[in-house]
Amino acid sequence: MKEALDTEKLINCARKFCSCQSKVYRSELFGITDGKAVGTFVEHLFKDFLAQQYDLTMGNSANGLDLPSVNTDIKVTSIKQPQSSCPYKDSKQRIYGLGYNLIVFVYQKEDDETNKKGMLNFLSCTYIDSSRTADYQTTIGLHNIINNKGNADDIYAFLADRNIPADEVTLYQMAQDILKNPPTIGYLTISNALQWRLQYSRIVSLEDNVSGITSIVKYDGK
């Protein structure tokens, strides 16, 4: 009987996955320039890798998280522009986080024109606890206001300037809640769209040790 997947096992598996799958040439990857197609390919490959070793509940992007048993979503993105999208559920997600963990694979793709095969080199892989999935500039700004004895009016004005998607009444209620319960500093860049647009450059280049962020494969900048 297989063991149940947990966060520690997930992180260890991701490290092994990046090591054994980097620079493996595959005919299925040749000529693919669509980041979404590459992402789907890697997600399925990683899920299969996990399922071979552990008992886990599978999900998919259509009905929720990729790995609901560990409250984690898989994100796969190119080093050229490390970003992805996620469903918008609540305007508070930008302040208090998405409500689930992320495991982010960042790759560089190369094609072998002679053999008609493509390969992915995983340059970075990071596990981000749900507590760190809020927007960096928004949470830093809120902490600065609170530390400088700001009040609910100051926070409301800041939220309005940051274009947090909510009406005036909701924004002011949020401002009062934030004053009582300041958010943890997030490390994503989250912008508004029909879905949230998540950007990971800060995560990829992070040098400091931050609780809740585990560097599985550290980007060396090359």
Predicted regions span which residues?
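Nucleic-acid endonuclease domains
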Residues: 1-68, 76-222
